[in-house]
Amino acid sequence: MNLEGKNVIVTGGSLGIGKETAKALVDKGANVLITGRSNKRLSKAVNYTGAKIIDFDIADINNITRNANECIKMFDGRVDVLINNAGLGVRKSIEELSIDDFLKVFNVNVFGLALFTKEIVPLMKIQNSGTIINIGSTASLKGYKTGSIYASSKFALRCLTQCWQAELRPHNIRVCQINPSEVTTAFGNPLRIEREDISNKLTAKEIAHSIISAIEMDDRGFINELNVWATNPFN
């Protein structure tokens, strides 16, 4: 896909992977709309990315349709690429598990994501084209200690991705999941303060590069899943 002039929505675009991806897309000539919960962070992201913004919480399930329609309206009814990047993570031992924590994470990582995508897909079907990028995690590949909530949400997203691939390929809609390993972003920080780059860890720019590469493949093909690891994070 040639990104010049394409309409792209990036959820969770005010920080980290979403912000870097939005900037890279704008630099490629795409029309980009980023969503996020904090108007203050979104306003800062505008200066960095050059993207349009809209503030809403993807976990607000009851208003998903209204919020999606606002996004669609800002693009005059055409969406070429949807990047489902908004995500939430917690670490809890088995003894600490609660339904509130499960719902808090799943409402963002699974339920809100799926219902927002549901609103965008009919446009792509009419267009007979489109690309959906789900930002997963290497936590979707193998469980780990204290990962009961977060990892299971990413396992669920991986399954959604595979189901959508089977369902949407006949409509020329490509669905890809990008699974980053540890990235130096604000992810997991309750104050949403971005971490300093560490020389041997992945940064948001590497993940943005992976996302752009998957999108820019000619539409006759697609990458179904891409795992992104730091080369040597062990030192």
Describe the residue ranges of each PLM region:
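Active-site helix of classical SDR
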Residues: 117, 153
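Residue(s) in the substrate-gating loop at a strand-loop-helix junction
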Residues: 137
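Substrate-binding pocket helix/loop in short-chain dehydrogenase/reductase
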Residues: 93-94, 101-103
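Active-site-adjacent segment of SDR/Rossmann-fold oxidoreductases
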Residues: 142, 163-173
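The beta1-alpha1 cofactor-binding region of Rossmann-like NAD(H)/NADP(H)-dependent oxidoreductases
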Residues: 56-67, 99
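C-terminal helical subdomain
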Residues: 170-171, 177-178, 185, 193-235
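Conserved glycine-rich cofactor-binding loop
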Residues: 14-15
